[in-house]
Amino acid sequence: IYGLPEQKLSDFENDLEKAISLNIQHISLYGLKIDEDCYFAKNPPKNLPNEDTQADMYLKAIEILEKNNFTHYEISNFAKQDYESKHNLNYWDNNTYYGFGVAAHGYENETRYFNSANLDEYINKPLQHKSSQKLTKQEQLEEEIFLGFRKMEGINIEKINKKFNIDFLKKYANIIDKYISYKY
């Protein structure tokens, strides 16, 4: 996690270099995010790096990791060749995954579900989901797109066309044209 209280770019670089020196094969990087419902939202830590510094940390991580033969395969994940997380890729490819344990989430048969966060409740009814939602075809399509955008390779339009029986470029022509017109 980067963007910690009082963390400077040089501190983050040193931490990253130390991690690399351990001969790791995979690393996930996440910027510190303080949720509005947590203790720190009401009592914020002092000296958090600003957004620009956090962006610099992220960009520096990409530079350092790629220089050390890590592939940036997903927005927050880097791996040496053949060490990409199969679990992560399964998730970002919007495939089935099962949630086992307290507060675990899963996705099966077009249904998202999560288990109770209460340990006693989960132990007494481990197969009963706390909540579930059957996704509509449109919701499934939207999830396929936004999850795919997390991967550096992006989305596979041909796969989406087959899976959802659509013409992606036709269906989203107006949105695509809008963003093309921005000329980033």
Language-model regions, residue ranges each:
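C-terminal scaffold of the Radical SAM
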Residues: 1-166
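Short amphipathic alpha-helical interaction segments
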Residues: 165-181
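Alpha-helix C-terminal capping/helix-coil junction sites
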Residues: 66, 180-183
